A protein has these predicted regions:
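C-terminal functional regions that serve as terminal interaction/effector modules
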Residues: 108, 114, 118-119, 141, ...
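Feature responds to low-complexity, polar/acidic, surface-exposed segments characteristic
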Residues: 1-35, 49-69, 74-106, 119-136, ...
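Positions within ordered alpha-helical repeat solenoids
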Residues: 43, 74, 114, 145-148
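Hydrophobic core segments within long, regular secondary-structure runs in both alpha-
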Residues: 38-42, 73, 109-110
Length: 157
């Protein structure tokens, strides 16, 4: 009963903390023509290729070189099982004028450029180009180079 003497039902009694509804990993892909492919990619849990904390994937946004470096580094780490790669260059001075050594993608960029998988955007000016979009030709070349590097780690290659 409340202060006026009326009966009321407690909303707390119906609320069950043991029951939760899982939110979709990405809520902005519902009507996307590649939804099934995006959901498959999300299941792989590749760093740099996941939905943000607000469950947005932004399927039509261009991928930056910084994000792409994270993706390739994560694949390299997963296949080689060398977790030390993720911190190999931390604490080093950045060789690029447009990338700080404390940037979230710094180690990934250094790992991939040191292995020749990704090129710097402008070697003369010393720029990696982290915010530049990744172009199709760069993707094809870097994936071939990554595949060549990983051949010895994968059976049947």
């Amino acid at each position: 009963m409340d202060a006026s003497g009326k009966k009321f039902k407690s909303p707390v009694k119906k609320f069950k903390t043991s029951q939760t509804e899982k939110m979709a990993e990405a809520t902005d892909i519902e009507d996307h023509p590649l939804r099934a492919d995006i959901e498959l990619v999300l299941q792989l849990k590749v760093r740099g290729l996941e939905a943000n904390p607000q469950h947005l994937f932004f399927p039509n946004r261009r991928i930056t070189r910084a994000e792409y470096a994270l993706m390739l580094e994560d694949i390299l780490i997963k296949v080689t099982q060398d977790k030390g790669l993720s911190t190999k260059f931390l604490g080093d001075r950045s060789p690029w004028s447009d990338v700080r050594s404390d940037a979230y993608y710094y180690n990934a960029a250094r790992t991939l450029t040191s292995r020749g998988i990704l090129d710097v955007r402008n070697a003369i000016r010393g720029e990696f180009g982290p915010d530049d979009p990744v172009h199709g030709s760069d993707v094809l070349l870097s994936l071939r180079l990554l595949k060549d590097e990983l051949k010895s780690y994968v059976r049947g290659s």
